[in-house]
């Protein structure tokens, strides 16, 4: 995605939380928010260097190279930060069109209908077929 010099100024300009994390929103080329995750310094640096989204898995306590198991990589076109420098917005191309482990286009598929959450988006591929 980009060449980095030895300066860490661009990383230090961000507001990391107490655990060294920053929220990251992934938005596809149509403007749809497809995912929310966290990044640490290592995952953000790797994302910039390799051009594919790399997050920090808080549950697995390791780098999560999006698509490493499913093949549904996220090619990063640009990275922006908000006015406070405490949230990242990744403009991505979602390879395979599936961002969610449930087999949907977006992780934001549940919609509030009255007092219930209902799935508003279809499953594009059975997760059993994605994660063999």
Swiss-Prot record:
It is an enzyme of class 3 (hydrolase). InterPro entries: PRA-CH, PRib_AMP_CycHydrolase_dom, PRib_AMP_CycHydrolase_sf. Its cofactor is Mg(2+); Zn(2+). Its EC number is 3.5.4.19. Pfam families: PRA-CH. Pathway: Amino-acid biosynthesis; L-histidine biosynthesis; L-histidine from 5-phospho-alpha-D-ribose 1-diphosphate: step 3/9. Binds 1 Mg(2+) ion per subunit. One of its GO terms (molecular function) is phosphoribosyl-AMP cyclohydrolase activity. It is found in: Cytoplasm. Its main location: cytoplasm. Belongs to the PRA-CH family. HAMAP family: HisI. Homodimer. This is Phosphoribosyl-AMP cyclohydrolase. The lineage of its organism: Bacteria, Pseudomonadati, Pseudomonadota, Betaproteobacteria, Rhodocyclales.
């Amino acid at each position: 995605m980009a060449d980095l010099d030895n300066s860490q100024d661009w990383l230090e300009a961000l507001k990391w939380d107490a655990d060294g994390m920053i929220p990251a929103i992934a938005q596809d080329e149509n403007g749809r928010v497809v995912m929310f995750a966290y990044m640490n310094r290592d995952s953000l640096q790797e994302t910039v260097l390799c051009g594919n989204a790399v997050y920090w898995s808080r549950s697995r306590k390791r780098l999560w190279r999006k698509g490493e198991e499913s093949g549904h990589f996220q090619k990063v076109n640009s990275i922006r930060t908000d006015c406070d420098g405490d949230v990242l917005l990744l403009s991505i191309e979602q390879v395979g069109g599936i961002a969610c482990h449930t087999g949907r286009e977006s992780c934001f598929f549940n919609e509030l209908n009255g007092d219930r959450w209902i799935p508003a988006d279809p499953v594009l591929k059975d997760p059993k077929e994605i994660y063999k």
